UniProtKB/Swiss-Prot annotation:
Membrane topology: Single-pass membrane protein
Record's compositionally biased regions (Low complexity): 299-326
TM annotation in the entry: 606-623
Subcellular location as annotated: Cell membrane
Signal peptide residues on this chain, from the entry's feature table: none
Start and end residues of each Guanylate cyclase domain: 396-511
Region (Disordered): 296-326
Active-site feature positions: 135 (proton acceptor)
GO molecular function: adenylate cyclase activity; ATP binding; protein serine kinase activity; protein serine/threonine kinase activity
The keyword Transferase is annotated on this UniProt entry: yes
Designated name of the protein: Serine/threonine-protein kinase pkn2
Amino acid sequence: MLAPDSLVLDGRFRVLRPLGSGGMGEVYLGEQVSLGRKVAIKVLHHDLHAQAGMAERFKREARLLSAVEHPAVVRIVDFGESGDHACLVMEFVEGESLYDVLTPGPMPPGRALPLLQQLAEGLAAIHDKGIIHRDLKPENVFISKSARGEQARLLDFGIARLVEPDAASSVSQIGVVLGTPEYLSPEQAVGAKVDTRSDLYSFGVLTYRVLSGRLPFDGPLPRNFLSQHASAAPLPLDRAAPTLSRYVGLLSLVMRLLEKDASKRPQSAHELADALAAAHSALSAFTPGLGTPAYVPQPGSGATPSSGTSVFGTGSASGSSSGPTGTAAFAGVAPAPQASSGTAAFGVASSSGSASGALPAASPHTGTASFGLKSSGGVAAVTGGNASVVKPQNLTVMLTDIQGFTERTSRQTHEENARMLETHDKLLMPLVKEHDGRLVQKRGDALLVVFRSPTAGVLCGMAMQDRLWRHNQTVPEVDRLNVRVCLHAGEVLATPDSVLGEPMEVIEAVEHVASAGEVTFTEAVNLARNRAEATAEPCGAITLPGRNEQLQLYRCQRAAEGPPFGDRFASQGSRGNALAPLLAKLQAVKLPTGLGELLRQRRREAALVAGAVVLLGAGAAWLSQRNDAGTRAFALLEDGKLNEALALMDAATDEEKELPSLRRARVAANHAKGHHISERTALSHLKEEELEDVEPLILDGLAEDYGKEPLTVLGNALARFPKDRLRAHYEDLAEEAYSLRQWGALRYLEFVKAADGVNLVRAYSEALNSPDCDIRTQAANRLAGLGDADAIPAMERVTSLPKAKGLLGSKDCGHEAAATAIKSLKQKSD
């Protein structure tokens, strides 16, 4: 025992009082003399310290632990020997042990899962340093509070060992009990070799205890626990805690952790952390506590919704009905709302085991929706067992809802609500398909859609608002549909019926400030979209959830009158109406003597008009071929009317299908559909002479493909094109603002070593605006490799940006390459 007020480690730390003791040593409250800061001082038992090789092993593990920097792992401040004692000095964590927190009973899943995820991430951090904890239990976890909420911390590495220790360092050889019997892995229980998956088993026992309030085995003696961990089947978690029975994915995850065979458990703490994050997102649509689903007003119950909260994948952060109407909440866990809140969980199994499903369309209570969970009638929510096989994707997420929907449903009859929703769906749902979007969930008035292309998402939103505008002109004001359309792009986990990830939180914040009739999107969408398709203007900013950072918002510019976006997406009508203003402009142009008179005399002859247009550079040569099926198909594709273009091509005669223009239109259509193998197959069928006249739309599409696919595949596809034309076109694209086609054009020119006509510093600086971390990393690395001091401002911008938030933590998006290059370039200039 150390006496109070004694000094250790050359007087750097003062002992204040004992805190406790264990099998490996005593722990004292101490003070760092130089700073007056509280610390925890762990002193190894003298008899252990005297064991051969223990002092060296202690130093080695302390050195490794000191390199672990993670908010869920207690920080090592110092270590060394003081007289006959080996001391480990750690930060002093104020809070409550998980053991004490669990004394009253199990922890609600909504509180438990974020803490467990933090612990899994901390465990991953120590595993990455080559350390196995070996003694995970509630007593070794502390819960502290901060301005950002609760933080779980891993403590006590007294019997941790290196993942690959030498034989002489094995703790088992010096007679120390390895771990706590209640939480031992089967490998530890039988004295077999352990690896990091042993900690995952112990983590499973801890999780079982947290969620159910009891252990998976009854014991009660240490030898009983050893035997049960080694060979007995654990009590199923849903039997230990029946209120968790609807959480199928979470149950599966916990029981996987308790597998005797380590190969059947999650294979890393990183995988476990991802599964817990997915479980939290999926489960947070439920109320915390005993897992009661959020209140679902039944048709005819008389309950009046008042909040209209749309929830995709997570629950509202507040159960109060005083929040803004029509908001989409994606973060936190919704407390049980009052009967008047109208918060409904759709597709969640009822307590009787039957699926609740979506409420009937006729119900006025369908305005509030919870997205991201499937019915438990046979299919698990996306958590635990299968979450780890869903790969992150960079997608554009769209959220739409009717402004004032909740108030409106409360004053309308069931029949009126049914008609309103039917009209809403008929107007908007076809547009999702036409723009290659995928409807993930539809709940009442709210749609959750994902697009692979930000441009397609923006164009779909514009088409929606135009179609709604036309509808609203034909009905009384009280019956108009005023819809908000919000878009954000980022890395998500997208399953057939849910979208999980930070972009869901961001789009919630966007929806809070968006206005009906607008298409509102974030800077991530604005940077990635094709800006030639639509003009946008800034419309304020939002604060990113959980961060003190501002995110700029944009909205598509509306027309001064008529349809907000010019009705360019109308599915009916022809291009004939567009011909009138073009001819009027032609009449106003002063033509050379004779030609003007000729045009006035023969203006109704399409071929001659087309000839005049070509001479004027007006870009309307298609007038001479307005009956050509291929030309009409291209016109529809350029207007974003993919389905109509496909219908026209399918209806073409056999003779028309052999037209070069229609064959090329088929290439462009396959690109628009995202069918890239079919696109390249159709391209390979084009004759050499057809490639001479290939439309820019096809070249643009191939450049876009080049922005996201392997270089060699597309290099072969483009090898047949006339090199001079391809190079000239792609040089123009490479000088544009960032888009996938800009990036693809730049990659192609570099690949074929034909980029000498491009300002590479400017082009790669543009690519730094990509929302894709991998593209920004490649661009930063290339800028660094150019060795041009002109690139310093762009690379300084990279280093000033926050790192991207990935599913496994922060991601380096070229920060290190840029910082190294800046240092090197500045040294050269000096």
